[in-house]
A protein has these predicted regions:
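Anionic-ligand binding patches
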Residues: 2-3, 10-133
Length: 133
């Protein structure tokens, strides 16, 4: 059995389904990790994985995800939550005006094992759209 430490329990099901194919049972452990900021996904993931492992006392999984806009390579990346909160829908519309709306949603899954980060990456290509309530 392996734990996924997350403050967002709906993230559990897709990971549990994938790991079940490998005969690995996954359990969710709700845990609030600090919101780490860095321009590098792996730097954020490594710090989160180490903190989670230390808090739980055993290796466990953590994730980090973000949006990558083709018009702005590498942006916003791991800073997606901060950028969306700061700019809002209208700011994102202005940012993308006249540029490509192609984007990738990137998700990393990581585990801190014996002082080393093990990680996996998945991507979903899409077109960025701004939705208004």
């Amino acid at each position: 059995m392996l734990y996924l430490l997350t403050s967002n329990p709906p993230k559990y099901k897709p990971f549990a389904d994938l790991l079940a194919q490998l005969q690995i049972a996954l359990r969710v452990h709700e845990f609030e990790l600090p919101e780490l900021q860095d321009e590098d996904f792996l730097a954020v993931l490594g710090r989160k994985a180490r903190l989670a492992c230390e808090a739980l006392g055993e290796p466990c999984l953590v994730d980090d995800a973000g949006l990558l806009l083709d018009a702005y390579p590498g942006f916003p990346g791991p800073l997606t939550r901060y950028v969306i909160k700061s700019l809002g829908a209208s700011g994102l519309e202005r940012l993308l005006a006249g540029t490509s709306n192609r984007a990738r949603m990137v998700c990393y899954l990581g585990c801190w094992v014996h002082g080393e980060l093990w990680h996996w990456r998945g991507e979903k290509f899409m077109r960025a759209a701004v939705f208004r309530p």
